[in-house]
Amino acid sequence: MICKGSSRRLPQKNRLDLNGKPMFMWNVQKLLRIAPRVYVSSDDHWILDEAEWAGAIPIKRPSELCGDTPNIPVYQHALQFMNGVSGIIAVQANSPTIDSKLIETARELLDRGYNEIMTMHEDRSIYGSIWALSRKKLENYKDFYNPKPEVLLLDPSTDVHTKKDFDEVQKICQKYSSSPR
């Protein structure tokens, strides 16, 4: 998981309290129930400490990969700390309403030999709340701004960028309180 400490539109959005826990923690907890190892890459020490306390493996992101950096170089950096993995399933920190079943589906597709799986909106535009990549595909990725997923999965979750998005997600998450989907 990539989890920046700052955000232009909604300051420190990943750290915002979402029904009793930082927003990013909703997906960390889902991933910890699904995957044997969960990695969190961040430029924020507090986020890394919280992730480690929850059971994830923290990866300190170097300054050259902070700011408006495409995700692929950040994933490639994180891959250096992941021994023996055949691929990654990256889940956005700011999409706390992702259904864990969708994450599991991405993992199953990766295990079946697909090299790139992403989520999409209902209008079929690429969303990327989940981005699964085989190790080989990730290591050899050419165009960071032009993903070519083999499989697109429909994801109705909300991506939080603004206070309005956060308020919407807060209402949804109240239904799940301490047990995220």
Residue ranges and their predicted role:
Residues C3, S42-D43, Q92, M120:
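Short beta-strand/turn micro-motifs composed of small residues
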Residues M1-P11:
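N-terminal nucleotide-binding beta1-loop-alpha1 segment
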Residues L16-D17, V40, A90:
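Conserved SAM-binding loop
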Residues R9, L48, I98-D99:
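Glycine/Thr-rich phosphate-binding loops of Rossmann-like dinucleotide-binding domains
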